[in-house]
Swiss-Prot record:
The keyword Glycoprotein applies. The keyword Metal-binding does not apply. GO terms for cellular component: host cell membrane; membrane; virion membrane. The lineage of its organism: Viruses, Varidnaviria, Bamfordvirae, Nucleocytoviricota, Pokkesviricetes. Its main location: virion. This is Protein OPG161. Residues 1-34 are intravirion. Signal peptide: none annotated. Glycans are attached at residue 135. It comes from Monkeypox virus. The gene is OPG161. It is found in: Virion membrane; Host membrane.
């Protein structure tokens, strides 16, 4: 064995031996911590991939359900919309179902008559059905304006999104489609 010649060499040899043991312990801890970090990263990646696949499947289910709901509602609105009204009297209660073969908006049914008629004929036809021509002010700021545009209004002028000079002219000879409400 090596014998140090002075105290300084003796301390340095001794401390190097202790330091070597500490390095081996630190290396083991670093390896264990590094392994734990790698394992946790792999688990995180796997869970993220699994969640992404799950969310993609759910998104496809929601989109197909939404597409079916939009299609069903469009068919229902186009075919007929109906409302349920309860009529309550003092003795009995009745369920009254009112159907609308047209556009339903805020309790009113807008039925399109695609035959072209003059204002007077359209007004008389709506009166025979116990209804009236729509007011421009009622439909101008709603989604209905896209449907009732260029049809007869209750004031005798065509319903349009914009006002122009021709609306004040004589429209007695014109024929248009019309809605009854």
């Amino acid at each position: 064995m090596m014998t140090p010649e002075n105290d300084e060499e003796q301390t340095s040899v001794f401390s190097a031996t202790v330091y070597g043991d500490k390095i081996q312990g630190k290396n083991k801890r670093k390896r264990v911590i590094g392994l734990c970090i790698r394992i946790s990263m792999v688990i995180s990646l796997l869970s993220m991939i699994t969640m992404s696949a799950f969310l993609i499947v759910r998104l496809n289910q929601c989109m197909s359900a939404n597409k079916a709901a939009i299609t069903d509602s469009a068919v229902a609105v186009a075919a007929a919309s109906s409302t349920h009204r309860k009529v309550v009297s003092s003795t009995t209660q009745y369920d009254h179902k009112e159907s609308c073969n047209g556009l339903y908006y805020q309790g009113s049914c807008y039925i399109l008559h695609s035959d072209y008629k003059s204002f007077e004929d359209a007004k008389a036809n709506c009166a025979a059905e116990s209804s009236t021509l729509p007011n421009k002010s009622d439909v101008l700021t709603t989604w209905l304006i896209d449907y009732v545009e260029d049809t007869w209004g209750s004031d005798g002028n065509p319903i349009t999104k914009t006002t122009s000079d021709y609306q004040d002219s004589d429209v007695s000879q014109e024929v248009r489609k019309y809605f009854c409400t």
